[in-house]
Amino acid sequence: MRPTGPTSLVTRRLIGELRRAARRNSAPVWLRVAELLERPRRRRAEVNLSKINRHARDGEMVIVPGKVLGAGALEKKVTVAALSFSLQALVKIRLSGSRAITLEEAVRENPRGSRTRIII
């Protein structure tokens, strides 16, 4: 039987790190993000900024277990953590005064996973 799951070593390492952080910090949010990242690439989340703007609150950390795309506008001050960002999304996030960080940085900044919202 063929192995399933991500073939990218970077993604596999990230999934392992998220699982360890979930156990170490009793933070089920990181376990859920790891499970979502284990999906096939074609089923991975692609989230537009308009959706983040609709569902997030000011000051929250928004986690996207996939790619953030630049459609729409971001009017709230949030921290967006994702596997990857489109160039247009990065520009719009920075112009709105929000922050764009990687998932590794999100685990380091918020190991307990408090005040986070997963958007898929």
Swiss-Prot record:
Gene3D superfamilies: 3.100.10.10. It comes from the Archaea. One of its GO terms (cellular component) is ribonucleoprotein complex. The keyword Ribonucleoprotein applies. GO terms for molecular function: structural constituent of ribosome. One of its GO terms (biological process) is translation. InterPro entries: Ribosomal_eL18/eL18-A/B/_CS (IPR021132), Ribosomal_eL18_arc (IPR022947), Ribosomal_uL15/eL18_sf (IPR036227), Ribosomal_uL15_CS (IPR001196). The keyword Ribosomal protein applies. Keywords: Ribonucleoprotein, Ribosomal protein. Belongs to the eukaryotic ribosomal protein eL18 family. HAMAP family: Ribosomal_eL18. This is Large ribosomal subunit protein eL18. The gene is rpl18e.
